[in-house]
From Swiss-Prot:
Annotated residues for binding of substrate: 85
Enzyme class: hydrolase
Listed GO MF terms: protein tyrosine phosphatase activity
Sequence similarity: Belongs to the protein-tyrosine phosphatase family.
Annotated InterPro entries: Prot-tyrosine_phosphatase-like, Protein-Tyr_Phosphatase, PTP_cat
Gene3D superfamilies: Protein tyrosine phosphatase superfamily
Organism: Styela plicata
Superkingdom of origin: Eukaryota
Encoding gene (name): STY-25
Name by which UniProt lists this protein: Tyrosine-protein phosphatase 25
Amino acid sequence: WLMIIEQKCNIIVMLAECVEAGKPKCHKYWPNDNMEETYGIVSVTNKEEIKYCGFTRRILLVSAKLKDGSVLTTVTQYHFTKWPDHGVPQTTSAIIRMHREIMKANKDLIGQSPIVV
């Protein structure tokens, strides 16, 4: 989360599930819907979670008290949920729709910020 704040990232893209084929693949780094979690000096609140066919969009409010002041920013996470444990998705429609939404959201942001994948 400190990297997200430092680099002023507004979009995170996640292409994997946390557990695939019964094995952990990724640590869940966000709180459940309408919940807050603290990760070190960073607090993350899941303000909104919208499930689409093939992906979930989460609006995360990220805050931290740093040496040089407090930071409060909004980060949107796009979580692709249709990738099978092995192989590739049967169709590309869900990932293309998610990609289009990410590109539109990034274009609408003021200033440039890297997208974290």
